[in-house]
């Protein structure tokens, strides 16, 4: 298992070539430190060239800010983006923005407090996780120049990092570092994020076993004729299978991580709302 700590990204040909080569050839997880969210455009250019379809989960406190930044990304960068979920956003920083209908897996800060595990399925399904320091409470990132009293705790931020390491997320990005002045608390918080990411990767490598899947097929699961669900008996994880075979560049989205509740809802004859949003997004790419 190899790790790539690319340092602070710079928009130059040398680093772009390096990232493109890593994405094209490496089977390892990639960890990137990034100055600001706008640098994600640079990463998406490289994933496009590497023919990687992206499902992105962004952890940030402002939907308005994220929407403004993403609107400036090049059309080429967005060609192979399946989804951009934006979570941990705060209402007063997001009132003027909305998430496009084709995107899914976005959660307000209020829905995550004391139940950060809500993000476990979205992170498991994503191949790019972007964690911005804006999402943290000021008390846990005291060196941040822009002050936000509300946010995730360092412990919740660490759970996100570990989940990215433990699941199939290929690229994990810690961003917003341009807004942080080094001090003892901030350095400790950022170091913990990296530690728990690595801990997640190591834990996964130690516990991984060949999946033992039990299939549950639901006939007439509207709007589809049938949908197959799978439960991994080794870890009780659930997956919903997209009903037609996907092309190679989308094969990572054939089986969608979900919960038992998605299966229970769908067994009544209609696909669960979260899975419906995801399948609609895949439909748009395939058709």
Tell me what each language-model feature is.
Residues 1-287:
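Conserved alpha-helical scaffold segments that buttress catalytic/binding sites
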